[in-house]
């Protein structure tokens, strides 16, 4: 048994309760984060190691969660491939999208030095974090990363040009995915080298295309990135949001832990992925916009589930929304920590 309830659980060790952390826990749901945003832009905070470290640790102090996740963005990989990224206005956008480029493979050039500030941020986080709190590193999944690279921006998670482009020239897309994979492996291994204790791959748009197409074009990349991390002895988490019944292709050969969205109950997922896999998820973040009574009601399922399954990390089906009252997040953390899990 270690100091960290998160690391014990992801290693299959039974603890007195499930660990709790949230995707997007270091973000707009926190008043302390919004105070910093009054002074600094998002990209500025991300690229300043001191600020990135500070933001990463805000939810540890403010919410009492059991793990920190690096404050960064999935779109640093396209930047490291030479694309110019901006966060001005409504979300991320690229100066030139791949759909507007005649030869995407020549357009993409390796600039791994663009990621150096992130490794400095990791060093700073490890200098200042509490001992019992592990740091989770991450990168975007290949499909999700390429969605943004190809379209150039996202409006309401809509990528109208991207999916037809896969069908038009699958061979080209596979070559672009290979470039994303190569840079993602380099990035992931550097994070491990600098001290992250677990690594999550965010495939936020896994449900955008048919499962068989995902399996052919993108899943080999997922295996390569997570496999490289696992070879270093670091536990891996895979979030395939929207994959639905396609989750049956997620097994222990692919990752150590699968992060589940809100579409399927945990007990059904457990039946599909088997007993060895650690589960993470899958409280619907939108419940946190309701009343404490509604939270109590929904929490009951998770309490009953966690009494039977210790290989489970309490998290959300996706990230915290800016509209969620921070009091409700605090309330949920308290419920996880103070409930009787019968272990």
Predicted feature residues:
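N-terminal basic, low-complexity leaders that serve as flexible interaction/assembly modules and, when applicable
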Residues: 1-89, 215, 224, 324-343
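Short glycine/proline- and acidic residue-enriched helix-loop micro-motifs
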Residues: 41, 101-110, 163-173
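A charged helix-plus-loop insertion that forms the helical arch/lid used to bind
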Residues: 86-99, 155-162
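A gly/proline- and charged-residue-enriched helix-loop-helix capping module
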Residues: 90-128
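Active-site loop segments of alpha/beta catalytic cores
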Residues: 114-343
